Amino acid sequence: MLELGAGLGLPSLAAAVRGADVLATDWAEDAVELLRRNAERNGIALRAEVVRWDEPAPLVGEAPWRLVLGADLLYERRNADQLLELLPRLGGDALLADPGRPFAKGFLERAAARWEIETATDGTIALHRLRLR
């Protein structure tokens, strides 16, 4: 399992506790370091790496990923653009949680050309499941 934009990595930590082989990634070195320390302190085995979406060789090299997770990623247009380029190269399904960021709607409209998209929402957070066609 791959998490993009992991930040503190709660989804990655939870998946690793349940036995998943996890790579948690973020562009911010300090976030990745905190995630590593948290995993180590709690005896959780996972990998955490600094990766930029515009330099995805480490991620693509391990593709296909069975599952790609991301939460609150679509707050900038460049994130939406880079994610549209990157996701098809990773393979597998993607689960993206979004709190209604401004670029989510456009991202989903463009993604629908290549992906089947299912959305569930509680009125605050939307969870989008993307499957390559």
Model segments located where?
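S-adenosylmethionine-dependent methyltransferases
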Residues: 1-133
